[in-house]
Amino acid sequence: MQRRNLILGSSLLALTPLAQALSETDAASGIRAALEKGANAAAGLLGRQDGYMGNPEVRIELPGALKSAAKLAQATGQGKKVEELQLAMNRAAEAAVPEARALLVNAIKSMSVDDGLKILHGGDDSATRFFEAKTRDPIGLKFLPIVQQATRKVSLADKYNAVAGKAAGFGLIKREDSNIDQYVTCKALDGLFLMIAQEEKKIRQDPVGTGSALLKKVFGGL
């Protein structure tokens, strides 16, 4: 009897690592699935007309100190040009977003099991922040030339750089905001990862609502 119990116990112990490995694999797969779902949803929402311009949460506005200059321009009959500049900034961001898809997917696929386990029990946007750390710079390099192409079509773009450069010299705006292309690229990235984070939070809070058995299994018990 004791021998039988010993054999049974040994068998159960042998199965434990397998169960743990399966659980870890599910965890990593769940994180990947959540990121992919969030990335696709965010890119779909932002990478279309008015994706940025029509959403107050991600709409790209002029930097704080330049808003006063914009009001002055509007008072002197240049309001239409200011509006054209802001619209161009947002259209540039909308045009750039589709370029992020391939990099986002590649980053998701490269996530290790250990990475998944570390962020599974993190905050509502912990996966997105890990993701952002891995992809923000390369996505920015993809965005920049598209933004440059769009802003060149606007007459106020050069004037923005001149005025913003002076404002940065006086410490009125951040140095990185003094170039319109860099500014729009940065804000476009901020908006993209904000939307991905919101999608991740939704999945964590309501995994059943995703319709995915895997996401329900991984996030349902958190």
Residues covered by each model-derived region:
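N-terminal export signals
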Residues: R3-A21
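N-terminal Sec/ER secretory leader and immediately downstream segment
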Residues: L22-A88, A93
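Short N-proximal segments of mature Sec-exported proteins
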Residues: A28, R32-E36, N40-A41, D125-T128, ...
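Hydrophobic alpha-helical segments involved in membrane association or supramolecular assembly
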Residues: A33-G44, E83, P98, A102, ...
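Residue-level signature of catalytic and energy-coupling elements of molecular machines
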Residues: A42, S112, P207
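Mid-length scaffold segments of soluble, non-membrane domains
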Residues: E83-A150
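An amphipathic alpha-helical core segment
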Residues: I146-L192
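A cross-kingdom marker for long, charged
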Residues: G191-L222
